Amino acid sequence: MADWSLLPNDLLELIVGHLETSFEIVLFRSVCRSWRSVVPPLDHSRCLGIKTHDISFNAGFTFSDQPTDQPPFKSSVDCTLKNIPIYLVKFWTPYGDDYLIAEMREREGGEPKLLLSPLSSNRIIYGMGINKVLFNSLTSPIIPFGQYYEITYFKKQPIRYRYGLPYHLWNEVEWVETSERVEFLRLHSEDSRDFAVLFAGRMCNLVMYRSRNMSWTQVVEHPETYAYQDLVAFKGKFYALDSSGRGRVFVVELSLRVTEIPSVKGSQYCSKESLVQLGEELLLVQRFIPAGRRYDEYIYTWFKVFRLDEEGGKRKWVQVNYLNDRVIFLGARTKLCCSVHKLPGANENCIVFLASNDGSIFDNDSVLLFDLKTRRTNTAFNECKGYMGVFGANLKSLVSCGLVTIPNPTTRFLL
């Protein structure tokens, strides 16, 4: 095995020149002492930034399929593409090895990073009611685990009733900041800056942004106008899954050509579907609830998993009954899939998902687990404590090793 500490300084300085955020510098400095000597410590007041791109809106463009003469956006430059990183933090406690999976967000005024659960829609904040969550990158490995992209922009929205707002203003409009999940595809170019973005939101049409043209373009719709419930960038193309519940997936090429992958044979209607990427594989995951059952009756929930087969140049879905040592996490804004060897105490061949249809987490019973081998569904934390770190529910471990500090009740102000 190569000794990374022996790399020459000029090569290390070249690597540092390609780091895009200060958090990447923190990770670089955590490798070994010789690497830390190349880059001075960061000022603690400095924000650990995330990667962003400014995206312009072409004149008359809207995210609907109808052009308009009225500017639908506050400014032609008020759209920002953000890369949201997800990290796996490993640590050691008196109870054994443990981990935390966290999405990191900006906060204003140079405050510490905000740690969120990447899988919940109600934006569970790690450290809520707790003074600090401290990571020592020298003793707790911080490993890039995943990422997703979103665009943030201002749009017009009718003013809803507010306490104290005069009645005659209720029909007025206001500019509201909006964030939407998108898929990002980096393209090959000389300066490595060319990219494409695909966006669906809650619409029945797709729009694509090309950095080379600096404009958005409507993608031709397929004949049946279902909304799209999931998008993924895979092997230089976009894949869009509609909400028909029949496993209908469309391949969207950069030329705006759209082709449909033959639906899963004999597929029955499912309540929810997701596209999950694992390395060089693309998975279609279908969730079923028998007719007449409610979402909260999780014991009746079951899943099917299919792998995209591209052999012979023809795409088709092949059912998968075993995930080997892997586990799939289905969240509200992102999906993750990895080997359980990366997650201490986790069970393999499972799908971890959320009980509510909107991806909200209210308590530990909101997180469920489906075992592909036994075909049983149970609450995840009762079935396997190793999944608590995915949702920050392992507070006892976090406190025991000093990553989390609990407020001193004698010095805390009560409001």
Swiss-Prot record:
Alphabetized Pfam families for the sequence: Beta-prop_KIB1-4 (PF03478), F-box (PF00646)
Domain F-box: 2-50
PANTHER family given in the database record: DUF295 DOMAIN-CONTAINING PROTEIN, F-BOX PROTEIN SKIP23
Protein's name according to its UniProt entry: Putative F-box protein At2g16290
UniProt organism field: Arabidopsis thaliana (Mouse-ear cress)
